[in-house]
């Protein structure tokens, strides 16, 4: 799943580079973080149910390793409502290009952190 997370991150970056709509960039950044978190939980044989909620996934990872709380402090979990709600009409949410750029950076930070945790577990 970590490979898929990096793929979604690369997609978000490419979409940013070609000037795609900010909401679709944020969506792929959120998906990247979600897949990385789920990869960590799978590695630890933790059930997470059917959820896309980053706040919940970070909490589940924090039960294994308290350092995951840093992701809450960095507001990584805020990608979830931004990515999900902005995809639907009439929500009143409009994402700016600056928010899309920030989403990519947050995804990079989160995936790098999670990848280090996965590698340390495997070694």
Predicted regions and their residues:
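Terminal alpha-helical segments
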Residues: 1-123
């Amino acid at each position: 799943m970590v490979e898929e997370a990096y793929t979604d991150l690369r997609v978000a970056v490419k979409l940013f580079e070609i000037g795609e709509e900010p909401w679709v960039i944020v969506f792929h950044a959120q998906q990247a973080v979600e897949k990385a978190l789920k990869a960590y939980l799978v590695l630890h044989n933790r059930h997470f149910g059917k959820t896309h909620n980053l706040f919940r996934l970070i909490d589940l990872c924090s039960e294994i390793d308290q350092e995951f709380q840093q992701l809450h402090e960095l507001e990584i979990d805020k990608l979830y409502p931004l990515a999900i709600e902005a995809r639907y009409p009439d929500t009143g949410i409009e994402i700016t290009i600056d928010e899309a750029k920030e989403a990519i950076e947050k995804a990079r930070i989160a995936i790098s952190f999670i990848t280090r945790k996965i590698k340390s577990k495997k070694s």
